[in-house]
């Protein structure tokens, strides 16, 4: 992939948002600024090292996502890795931003070579661009790819997993709400009220919790786009505060509550074995739906992680090539 193609793929990627957050490059660490201003090739080396760190952390994140069951500890590790990636992405954007705005003197041989070169050169039919322009294009995109792509999945996975963990706690309590209905072994006693109360609390806690965006609202078109990206059955698009959000699809919990209502009691209900098995089969089916939703979402996050990792790999290779070229042109 040549540099122009790489730049175009970054700036026109479907994962790059229309809205940008410039705050990440406005406040620049003084050490980074000093290093970049004084030693451009050293700063490119620092940039490449930072991209390497991003890939290392990204691999650790992918390992956490590969677990069959996400625990509270897993979520904490995922959040920690995501935070580290964000810091390193921010650092990379700062370095790129300064490189794109700083002028450096070139040596005598390089100046003579450039004087003999055409003012506008083309490669493979593409107009060539300067390294400064390349740094600016990447700096404008790399933060947003993290914030508006990877972190969308992180928030969605975290929110849905938290909901399912609370549901798992209800499942653990369910064993204590079921007992034999008589001495003949032909019936089961179910504490319907206890189960309904627990499921109702879960519903209230999560029916308005957004999967996307984490804060504020977006257009209906944007919400529908991300519902498709996250998995159509995992959420629902709903209006909120003049905009739209993708909320957790609580239909499985609603169905569980409806089936409890159909048992014909709101306290302790005795069911014959056939009726209990029918109820339990429906309950388990809704549980399986939520498990599948979570599994699909985690897999999509893992895929997004791989796409981001490949992008960083290409950027790192490109920057290494640019560093070698710049060594021929710059004074140190």
Swiss-Prot record:
Which residue positions does the secretion signal occupy? none
* Compartment list: Secreted
- Compositional bias ranges of the Polar residues kind: 26-43
From which domain of life does this come?
Bacteria
| GO CC annotation, single | extracellular region
State the SUPFAM superfamilies in the record: IpaD-like
Keywords recorded for this protein, A-Z = Coiled coil, Plasmid, Secreted, Virulence
Extract the ranges annotated as region (IpaB binding).
192-267
Composition-biased stretches, type Low complexity, lie in: 1-25
Which chain positions lie within coiled-coil regions?
44-77
Q: Where is this region: Disordered?
A: 1-43
* Protein family per UniProt: Belongs to the invasin protein D family.
Q: What does this protein do?
A: Required for bacterial invasion of host cells. Controls IpaB and IpaC secretion, and the efficiency with which they are physically inserted into target cell membranes. These proteins are exported via T3SS to form a pore in the host membrane that allows the translocation of the other effectors into the host cytoplasm. Along with IpaB, is essential for both blocking secretion through the Mxi/Spa translocon in the absence of a secretion-inducing signal, and for controlling the level of secretion in the presence of this signal.
Domain writeup: The N-terminal domain is an intra-molecular chaperone that prevents premature oligomerization of the residues on the coiled-coil region that are involved in interactions with the needle and/or itself. The residues in the C-terminal domain probably form oligomeric structures at the tip of the needle that are responsible for the regulation of secretion of other effectors.
| Identification of the protein by name | Invasin IpaD
């Amino acid at each position: 992939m040549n540099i122009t193609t790489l730049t175009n793929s970054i700036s026109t990627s479907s994962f790059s948002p229309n809205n940008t957050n410039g705050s990440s490059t406005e406040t620049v660490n003084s050490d980074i600024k000093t290093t970049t201003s004084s030693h451009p090739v050293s700063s490119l080396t620092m940039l490449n090292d930072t991209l390497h760190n991003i890939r290392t952390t990204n691999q650790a994140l992918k390992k956490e996502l590969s677990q069959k069951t996400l625990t509270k500890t897993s979520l904490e590790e995922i959040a920690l890795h995501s935070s580290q990636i964000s810091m390193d992405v921010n650092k990379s954007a700062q370095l790129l931003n300064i490189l794109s705005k700083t002028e450096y003197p070139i040596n005598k041989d390089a100046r003579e070579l450039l004087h003999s070169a055409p003012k506008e050169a083309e490669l493979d039919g593409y107009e060539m661009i300067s390294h400064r322009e390349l740094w600016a294009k990447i700096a404008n995109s790399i933060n947003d790819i993290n914030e508006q792509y990877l972190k969308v999945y992180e928030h969605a996975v975290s929110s849905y997993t938290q909901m399912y963990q609370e549901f798992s706690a209800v499942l653990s309590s369910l064993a204590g709400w079921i007992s034999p209905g008589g001495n003949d072994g032909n019936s089961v006693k179910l504490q319907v009220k206890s189960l309904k109360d627990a499921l109702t609390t879960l519903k209230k806690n999560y029916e308005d919790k957004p999967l996307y965006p984490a804060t504020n609202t977006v257009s209906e078109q944007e919400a529908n786009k991300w519902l498709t990206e996250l998995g159509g059955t995992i959420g629902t698009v709903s209006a909120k505060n003049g905009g739209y959000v993708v909320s957790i699809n609580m239909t499985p919990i609603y169905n569980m509550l409806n089936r409890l209502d159909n048992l014909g009691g709101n306290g302790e209900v005795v069911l014959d074995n056939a009726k209990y098995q029918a109820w339990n089969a429906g309950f388990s089916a809704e549980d399986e739906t939520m498990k599948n939703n979570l599994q699909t979402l985690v897999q999509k996050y893992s895929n997004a992680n791989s796409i981001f990792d490949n992008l960083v790999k290409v950027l790192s290779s490109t920057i290494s090539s640019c560093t070698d070229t710049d060594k021929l042109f710059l004074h140190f």
